[in-house]
């Protein structure tokens, strides 16, 4: 079965952004931050390649296309999703919006970590240890850090709100400087 994925570029004061959506389910499946358009698109292509390598046994193939191929109904939906995403990035609305996420990669544990992370409101931070307790597994701190490092839907899954136990900003795929900027914008630090 063939699945269409569509990408769009956005610009924001904090970072250049590329989002990838699945129009058939109206879901956000991937976000990359910072870098040039070619780098961001390269990140998306690597993501789709990994999804395809894990999905081919199931008979699924994902194809990545520019948003220009969309029909007008889908363009309106994508424009709304893009607007909502930029509002989250700007700290204007919380990540618990009507942006539907679909995880094309990830174990059940990772997906549980990501869903729990989505509940952390803008302006708040918690430690990896606190997140482990929320998940009912206080000893899973390293596993949680690993799961967050594999988060493919930055900002909407707000892994930037997870900090070290002593309040130190640690681990963010797109850089500690961007993590700090996001938290300052949300008035969390």
Curated annotation (Swiss-Prot):
DNA binds at residues 128, 142, 165. The keyword DNA damage applies. Its main location: nucleus. GO terms for molecular function: DNA binding; methylated-DNA-[protein]-cysteine S-methyltransferase activity. This enzyme catalyzes only one turnover and therefore is not strictly catalytic. According to one definition, an enzyme is a biocatalyst that acts repeatedly and over many reaction cycles. Belongs to the MGMT family. This is Methylated-DNA--protein-cysteine methyltransferase. It comes from Kluyveromyces lactis (strain ATCC 8585 / CBS 2359 / DSM 70799 / NBRC 1267 / NRRL Y-1140 / WM37). The lineage of its organism: Eukaryota, Fungi, Dikarya, Ascomycota, Saccharomycotina. The gene is MGT1.
């Amino acid at each position: 079965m063939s699945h269409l994925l569509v990408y769009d570029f956005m610009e924001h004061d904090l970072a250049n952004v590329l989002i990838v959506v699945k129009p058939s389910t109206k879901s956000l499946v991937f976000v990359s931050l910072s870098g040039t358009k070619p780098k961001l698109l390269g990140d998306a292509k690597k993501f789709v390649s990994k999804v395809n390598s894990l999905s081919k046994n199931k008979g699924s193939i994902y194809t990545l296309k520019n948003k220009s191929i969309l029909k007008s109904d889908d363009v309106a939906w994508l424009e709304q999703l893009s607007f909502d995403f930029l509002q989250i990035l700007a700290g204007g609305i919380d990540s618990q919006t009507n942006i539907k996420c679909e995880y094309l990669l990830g174990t059940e544990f990772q997906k549980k970590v990501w869903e729990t992370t989505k509940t952390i409101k803008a302006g708040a931070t918690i430690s990896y240890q606190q997140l482990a307790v929320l998940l009912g597994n206080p000893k899973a701190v390293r596993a949680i850090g690993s799961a967050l490092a594999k988060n493919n839907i930055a900002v909407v899954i707000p892994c930037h709100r997870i900090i070290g136990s002593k309040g130190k900003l640690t681990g963010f795929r797109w850089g500690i400087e961007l993590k700090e900027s996001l938290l300052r914008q949300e008035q969390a630090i």
